[in-house]
Amino acid sequence: MKIPILPIVALLSLLALHAAQGAALGTPMEDTTSSNYPSGTEGLSEFLNFNKLQSAFKSDDFLNWHVLTDMFKKALPFINWEFFPKVKGLRSAVPDSQ
């Protein structure tokens, strides 16, 4: 079974950036609060751990490829990361000298 990693990573990064920017800047169209939603979504937020993602995007290591790959490996431990040779190969690559 193939799991589309790129769309999942893009969606998670957009969600983290959206939450980090304080959501919408204007007034809401309707009164929607977290109390309107069932409490069953708490498990999902603990699974995705948005606070950890926000802290990763605010740090100085935001553009560090190794930190980003380690963050996603820790956030998604159920994916077999050894299956992706490009991700595994980038960890051992020597950085380009400029």
Curated annotation (Swiss-Prot):
Q: What induces it?
A: Up-regulated in suprabasal cell layers of embryonic and adult epidermis.
Pfam assignment, any one: KRTDAP
Provide the alphabetized UniProt keywords: Differentiation, Secreted, Signal
GO BP, sorted A to Z: cell differentiation; epidermis development
Q: Where in the cell is it found?
A: Secreted
Tissue expression remark:
Ubiquitously expressed in stratified epithelium.
- Principal place of residence: secreted
The superkingdom listed in its UniProt entry is Eukaryota
Q: Spell out the InterPro entries in the cross-references.
A: KRTDAP
Give the range the annotation lists for the signal sequence: 1-22
Q: Which GO terms describe its cellular component?
A: extracellular space; lamellar body
What this chain does, per the entry, is described as:
May act as a soluble regulator of keratinocyte differentiation. May play an important role in embryonic skin morphogenesis.
Q: What is this protein called?
A: Keratinocyte differentiation-associated protein
Species per Swiss-Prot/TrEMBL record: Rattus norvegicus
